[in-house]
Amino acid sequence: MEGTLFNIWKGATRDGPGIRTVVALKGCPLRCIWCHSPESWSYAIEKYSNGETVGWKTTPEKIVEEVLRDKPFYDASGGGLTLTGGEPLAQAEFCAEILRLAKKAGLHTALETSGYAPLNVVESVEPFVDIWLYDVKLLDSENCLRHTGRPLKPVLENLRRLSAAKSRIVMRCPMIPGINDDEAELKARGALADELDSVEALDVLPYVPYGIDKAHRLGLKVYEAPQPPPEYGPLIAAKLSGLTSKPVCLAGNGKSVAERGVAAHGRICYNGGMGNVEERLCGLF
């Protein structure tokens, strides 16, 4: 069996617990206009305008072999393998086999997903996933279809199915100025997190314009907006923390500490009303 990747990052600390290797599978059914990885959209191996190749074919066995090279770091930090994309569930059998072999090898596994996949695909990988990093992009059905190109319904159905199965879930919240950061969206996110017992935390990911240059080099169009000011992320996270009982994390560099939070593994953590969440989140991330 072979599948297509477009990147591997080693030593990652923001994509699940501990030190991790992040493996990015190529191909995605969504077309989020703010996407920071437009090179992940196509399932095919491509070339940038400068001739640089994007993507390569490999096997699950070779991926797990490469990931295992850093196992001492995972063991020391509680880390492991994170699969991302694109949308990893779009290469369903390939994704499932990587995760199966990783678990067989004793690796902790995380899966970052948009949740846009058939239920049977989600169920096929569920036994091999230790924690789900579940991107909730928009909670207004009309806006979701407009800005991602796909309907919201299956995303929520799969999320609720995973929560009912008591899967560990971190709700990731990419926040895009003027698109999904209004009061109604934030309230909906907080309410959804409180509704689902298996959601352990919310992870705020402020917009960054990483995808613009890559899109231009591939002849694609994405949302072109400047990076929001440094205070944008903390303000969104602080607002969201007041709308949910769950902990809220803000992806950051750990250099500035918000008044109500502490830096933990590159994240600023906000108390969502659950007591000493700083200690809980240091264990989670």
Predicted regions and their residues:
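Short, exposed beta-strand "edge-strand" segments with a Pro/Gly-rich flavor and a Y/T-containing core
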Residues: 52-58, 117, 128, 136-137, ...
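Generic secondary-structure boundary signal with a strong preference for alpha-helix termini
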Residues: 28, 39, 97-98, 218, ...
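Conserved AdoMet/S-adenosylmethionine-binding subsite of the radical SAM
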Residues: 64, 68-211, 216
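Short glycine-enriched, charge-decorated loop/helix-capping segments at active-site entrances
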Residues: 48-53, 145-151, 218-226
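Fold-independent oxyanion-binding glycine-rich loops
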Residues: 8, 25, 38, 60, ...
